[in-house]
Amino acid sequence: MPDGRPAVRPRIGIADPSDVVRRATRAVGRPVRDLAPLPGGNSSLTYAATTDAGVRVVVKVAPPGLPPVRNRDVLRQARALTALTAVADVAVPKVLGTDSGEPPDVPPLFVMSFAEGESYEPRHTELTRRPPAAEVRERGAAAARMLAALHTVGAAELGIAEEAVSPQAEVERWCAALATCELEPAAAQAESECRSRLTAALPAPLRPAVLHGDWRLGNMQCVGAQIRAVIDWEIWSVGDPRLDLAWLRLMSDPEHPTAVAPDAPALEPDELLAVYETASGEPVADLGWFDALVRYKQAAASALLVKNAVRRDQVTERVERMRHGVPLLLAAALTRLTR
């Protein structure tokens, strides 16, 4: 139609490829073609494409038919990526252009640079042929150093004015999520005790930093030992920097209950901490509390996923692993709160 709106309302979550190409072309100021779906992210539609100069790019589009809010707010992601280009030694894709659309029917989108490489999460991926162990371990060290570099700059210094989420608010968020899920009696008891201990021992906050929300090797494009770009910023926020560090350590923990390759070569959690502290130049206080919080958080996120899978009659082997992991994560959180 002349005003750029689709002639018919789109199906929810289904984008019109010709519309995406047209608006991506307008956003970057040169023709974009060869649009193809690209795995990555869970909250938006992601495509690979090529400019007329043969340069590969990525187009992220909010789901059509839904308000572009929270983790569907792709323009918010673009603003964060643009701000983070000012942080030395933090590799993120470059934003090449945006289009605000007319949501919800014409969804917002942005175009960013394409980062070559692989996203490999050592202890949560089953591969017949793994990358060389030395390369994977160096990727872990690079991820810890890059996280320390990110934390050298406060969110306010980057021009990000969003309100910081406090550790207490994090506890309350995941407590509310768990309250909607049916837990076995032992798990329910562990949840109650864990929540009480987390609330009773709230740590003194640090300067708010930009948080990725899922900082791990599986969200990084790597070539050899080098991290080319940290991707999938849908759930970024501003909060206590120890959250992302604790999450990185959790994903490297060989005792993680849903780890499918616990013996895969990777930096151990304490090695990641040592690299981070060396890079930041100071010890990390009260990290045990955050180690407990991220396990409580993942127990809540897993319980929600299990609940929804059961409701949709889509229980898979992966879902069963998560169901089994919920009480184990809560028990592991309690262990870290009682040391």
PLM feature segments, named:
Residues 19-20, 76, 80, 142-146, ...:
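Charged catalytic carboxylate motif
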Residues 36-170, 176-194, 203-205:
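ATP-binding pocket architecture of kinase catalytic cores
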